[in-house]
């Protein structure tokens, strides 16, 4: 299955070392292990992908470093990701929930794409 993993959260570098980054890497790693064709679409990559994920196709839609209207920039990046995926036509979109991103909702509505909205938050 062709799966697009989307992370439009600028606070999470998908190739980083923070907990959310490691979680994304583990999900992608498991999907690949199960034989799926996975591509990562993110606004922030981090510096170096883990060696075992270096072959996973990755597209970045970076946000400006200093932006007066960061929320608008995030929404525009999400639109750019959605536009790319509308032409790529994955079988499934797996989106890590982030504010101002409507990638999965848009593709489900316009293309009928199946999806997973991953909501992952610490319990306090």
Where are the regions a protein language model picked out?
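N-terminal subdomain of nucleotide-sugar transferases
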Residues: 1-48, 52-54
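Active-site proximal beta-strand in glycosyltransferases
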Residues: 3, 108-124
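Generic beta-sheet signal
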Residues: 6, 41, 61, 118-119
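A short, charged, and often flexible helix/loop element on the N-terminal side
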Residues: 54-83
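Glycine-rich phosphate-binding loop signature in dinucleotide/nucleotide-binding domains
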Residues: 84-90
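Short His-centered aromatic/hydrophobic patch
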Residues: 95-100, 119
């Amino acid at each position: 299955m062709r799966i697009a993993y989307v992370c439009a959260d600028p606070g999470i570098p998908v190739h980083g070392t923070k907990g959310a980054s490691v979680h994304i890497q583990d999900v992608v790693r498991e999907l690949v292990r199960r034989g799926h064709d996975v591509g990562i679409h993110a606004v922030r990559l981090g510096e170096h992908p883990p060696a075992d994920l270096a072959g996973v196709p990755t597209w970045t839609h970076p946000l400006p470093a200093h932006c007066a209207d960061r929320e608008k920039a995030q929404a525009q990046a999400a639109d750019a990701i959605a536009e790319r995926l509308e032409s790529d036509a994955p079988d499934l979109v797996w989106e890590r929930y982030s504010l101002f991103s409507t990638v999965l909702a848009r593709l489900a509505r316009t293309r009928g794409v199946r999806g997973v909205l991953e909501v992952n938050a610490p319990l306090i």
